[in-house]
Amino acid sequence: GSLQLLLLLLLLQCDKKGICSCAPLLTAMSSPRRIKEDLSSDEEGQVHPTLSPSEDHKIKISSLPFSVEALMADKRVPKEAPPSRAVDSSAATSTPNRHLHLGIRDSPSPLGSQKGLKPRRSNRKNSEDGTSWSKDGGSYSPPPRHLSPSSCTLRKHKTNRKPRTPFTTSQLLALERKFRQKQYLSIAERAEFSSSLNLTETQVKIWFQNRRAKAKRLQEAEIEKLKMAAKPILPPGFSIPFPINSPIQAASLYGSSYQFHRPVLPIPPMGLYATPVGYSMYHLSEEGDMT
């Protein structure tokens, strides 16, 4: 009887305070068999609180969504729940953002995949180039130069070209004497002169052509020398007020103590550089050897 009274008091307290606060006391006041069952259920990892039929009925009523207690609980919870909802909403907003960031990074879109794959391929190529460079020992071998085909070949001599005829000294002297006399030979003169020297007419003809070209070059060189000598050596602003050709004025340059007065010969201005426009035998013989 005393146990029933205690149970009733506990039920009243549970109605006032709530079922959850009185649940451990009810389990302690239950029979030892129930305690053993609770211990065995705790060991198995499943919690089944053993309550009286009235308490089970109240729990079932409270578990119904449209019961008075459930509605009262819903009214009380929203006042205390906003922070949790705010936390949940912040977590929910953060998770989509994370998913968005992850989606941007790991999106399987074809454009993203292509853009992401292209630099990787280039990196692979670079790495392969680097490995080949390291394998070669860091020595860069330039690509082999392809030799261009010899399209611009030099002009080849004719195979049927006649060999150069070496003239003797007597022949060269005779040719030089004849060239001084007459630079152009007629056909009859050339035939007679070539037979006298035991040469062909073509050999004599070619020698005279070469000798005329050489004489022209020498004459042009002499004219250039004369032009260079005609230019004044001294600058135009500098001039000597007295001529140095007279022996008296030349002696006055050296002073009165100069005893031996050598007569100074008059020197023409072109005499130092000018040479007679003629051909000596040495030049002619040398030119004949060259031809």
UniProtKB/Swiss-Prot annotation:
Disulfide bonds: none annotated. The keyword Nucleus applies. GO terms for molecular function: DNA-binding transcription factor activity, RNA polymerase II-specific; RNA polymerase II transcription regulatory region sequence-specific DNA binding. It is found in: Nucleus. Residues 160-219 bind DNA. Residues 36-58, 75-169 are annotated as: Disordered. It comes from the Eukaryota. GO terms for cellular component: nucleus. One of its GO terms (biological process) is embryonic morphogenesis. CDD domains: homeodomain (cd00086). SMART domains: HOX (SM00389). Pfam families: Homeodomain. The keyword DNA-binding applies. PROSITE patterns: HOMEOBOX_1, HOMEOBOX_2. Residues 154-164 have a biased composition (Basic residues). InterPro entries: HD, HD_metazoa, Homeobox_CS, Homeodomain-like_sf, Msh_Homeobox_Regulators. Keywords: Developmental protein, DNA-binding, Homeobox, Nucleus. Belongs to the Msh homeobox family. PANTHER family: HOMEOBOX PROTEIN MSX (PTHR24338), HOMEOBOX PROTEIN MSX-2 (PTHR24338:SF10). This is Homeobox protein XHOX-7.1'.
